[in-house]
UniProtKB/Swiss-Prot annotation:
Gene Ontology BP, a term: L-histidine biosynthetic process
Quaternary data: Homodimer.
Entry keywords, A to Z: Amino-acid biosynthesis, Aminotransferase, Histidine biosynthesis, Pyridoxal phosphate, Transferase
GO molecular function: histidinol-phosphate transaminase activity; pyridoxal phosphate binding
Reaction catalysed by this enzyme: L-histidinol phosphate + 2-oxoglutarate = 3-(imidazol-4-yl)-2-oxopropyl phosphate + L-glutamate
Name of the molecule in the record: Histidinol-phosphate aminotransferase
Pathway the protein acts in: Amino-acid biosynthesis; L-histidine biosynthesis; L-histidine from 5-phospho-alpha-D-ribose 1-diphosphate: step 7/9
Pfam families for this protein: Aminotran_1_2
The UniProt record lists the keyword Amino-acid biosynthesis: yes
NCBIfam families (UniProt xref): hisC
Species, as recorded: Vibrio vulnificus (strain YJ016)
PANTHER family: HISTIDINOL-PHOSPHATE AMINOTRANSFERASE (PTHR42885:SF2), HISTIDINOL-PHOSPHATE AMINOTRANSFERASE-RELATED (PTHR42885)
Cofactor dependence: pyridoxal 5'-phosphate
EC number(s) given by UniProt: 2.6.1.9
Length: 346
């Protein structure tokens, strides 16, 4: 059957998510998931009816949380669908291109390749910031520029002045897509205030991380109303199941937001605990992180990753040499991981 598939799909290497990689253990710190398992009320009385394309209560709740108008808000099956919608809506296959800056999230590349859109890369600088001159030199045919901040897997924030410079550079040429999947851990760094000034800005958000709803698959795209209307032309007719909309709306209620804020404070404290503990181990380089994960450089990253895996501590290997990404879990999970790494290098 594979020979019937499009040639580009035959050559495609799928994104290796944490679940596809697998593993067995009792400490799962490989997918930047929340350790909190919150309870929600669900109503299954209306499952015989299709959901609204854009459930009004959910859109209103997230728009209020994000500080934008409902008309500037689109919900989808995770932020990953937002990536795909943007590429499908704005890029002509075999004609246009996207641009992204590795090391960064892998789905920009996979989504573009699946659709048949050229992928241009301009690597981040040594301190993992944007190479603005390199981006400018490669903007020909580019319709979308993806920037992740906090960046996954490095954890750093992209300089605000560089984001503004990029928006100015791409005016009337391309859309800058800010992936803010982890912005709830550092909301002061959001670019949402720039939407009023730049019509070529789109922002991706998710409930998977800070809201502890990775299994729900609920994301958002924030942009000007004209851009949102373009995305509504290509989105599926019923993208958000009824239970998803109900649970997500509960998570964005006053009580839900208070709980999420408390849990973010807890996870940020655990990140600081893990960062300090790891930095005290000789030979390790711990990079400052702003999301719910840390990137750590080990003397022998692959060996450390394998040893942890065999001990039931599932971390995430990185394309960066000798680096491993560690999600911030519960304090108990952080203590177990820190204890294992200490013993490994003792």
């Amino acid at each position: 059957m594979e020979k019937l598939a499009r040639k580009s799909v035959q050559k495609l290497t799928p994104y290796l998510s944490a679940r596809r990689i697998g593993g067995t253990g009792d400490v799962w710190l490989n997918a930047n998931e929340s350790p909190f398992d919150n309870e929600y009320r669900t109503n299954f009385a209306r499952l015989n009816r299709y959901s609204d394309c854009q459930p009004k209560a959910l859109i209103a709740a997230y728009a209020a949380y994000a500080g934008v108008k409902p008309e500037q808000t689109l919900t989808s099956r995770g932020a990953d669908e937002g990536i795909e919608l943007l590429i499908r809506a704005f890029c002509e296959p075999n004609e246009d291109a996207i641009l992204y800056c590795p090391p960064t999230y892998g789905m920009y590349s996979v989504s573009a390749e699946t659709i048949g859109v050229e992928r241009k890369t301009v690597p981040l600088t040594e301190d993992w910031q944007l190479d603005l001159s390199g981006i400018e030199a490669n903007l020909d045919k580019v319709k979308l520029v993806f920037v992740c901040s906090p960046n996954n897997p490095t954890g750093n924030l992209v300089k605000r002045e560089d984001i503004i410079a990029l928006l100015e550079m791409t005016k009337d040429r391309a859309i800058v897509v800010m992936d803010e999947a982890y912005i709830d851990f550092c909301p002061e760094a959001s670019t949402v205030d720039l939407l009023a000034q730049y019509s070529n800005l789109a922002i991706l958000r998710t409930l998977s991380k800070a809201f502890a709803l990775a299994g729900l698959r609920c994301g958002f795209t924030l942009a000007n109303e004209e851009l949102i209307n373009v995305l509504l032309k290509v989105i599926a007719p019923y993208p958000v199941p009824v239970p998803v909309a109900e649970i997500a709306t509960q998570a964005l209620s006053e009580a839900g937001l208070a709980r999420a804020k408390f849990q973010v404070l807890d996870l940020n404290a655990n990140r600081a605990y893990l960062q300090v503990g790891l930095s005290m181990i000789a030979g390790l380089e711990v990079f400052e992180g702003w999301g719910n994960y840390l990137l750590v450089k080990f003397p022998n990253g692959d060996e450390l990753f394998k040893a942890a895996w065999e001990s039931g501590i599932i971390l995430r290997n990185s394309p960066i040499k000798d680096c491993v990404r560690i999600s911030v879990g519960s304090r108990d999970e952080c203590e177990k991981t820190l204890g294992f790494i200490r013993n490994y290098y003792s």
